[in-house]
Amino acid sequence: MLLTPTHKFILFTLGFWYKEANKKLVSKPLQIFISKALFIDIVKKAGMVEKQPRALYKNLETLEKNRFVEYNNKCLSLTKKGEKAFLKIQKDITPYIIVARLVAEKDPLSYSKKLQTKFSL
C-alpha cells in the first residue's frame, strides 16, 4: 500500500513521539506505550493536527489494517513495516529540517555580503 500524506504524517508523528518519549528510559528496561485515544488526545492538544478525533481514529485503523501499526493490550505501536516506513520518512525530511533550523538559528543575511535589495511596491 502506498501511504497517503495523511498516513505518512500520522506514522511520522507516532514514531517520532515514541522515539522522543523513550529517550529518557534508554538506561532502564522500560518502554513507554500509549493507547489510540491518548495518542489522538496528545496530537490534538499539541496542535499538531486540525482533524477531528474520529478522522484520526479512522486513519489509525487504516494503518493498522495495512500492518504499519498494531494495537495490543491498549498499546499502540509501530510494526517492523511501520518502523521501516517511519525511518524512510525521517530520512526524506531530515534535509528540510536541517535547512529550517540553520536559517532560523542564524540571520539569513549574514551568509553573504553581496546581497541585492530592491524597492518593492
Residue ranges and their predicted role:
Residues 1-34:
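Short alpha-helical segments that sit at the start of domains
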Residues 75-80:
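Minor-groove-contacting beta-hairpin "wing" of winged helix-turn-helix DNA-binding domains
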Residues 48-65:
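Short amphipathic alpha-helical interaction segments
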Residues 83-113:
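Short, amphipathic alpha-helical interaction segments positioned at domain boundaries
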Residues 29-53:
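Short helix-coil junctions and helix-kink-helix linkers
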Residues 64-74:
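A short, conserved structural fragment
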Residues 115-121:
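Domain-edge interaction signal
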Residues 2-6, 31-32, 55, 109-115:
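Clustered cysteine/histidine zinc-coordinating segments, centered on FYVE zinc fingers that bind PI3P
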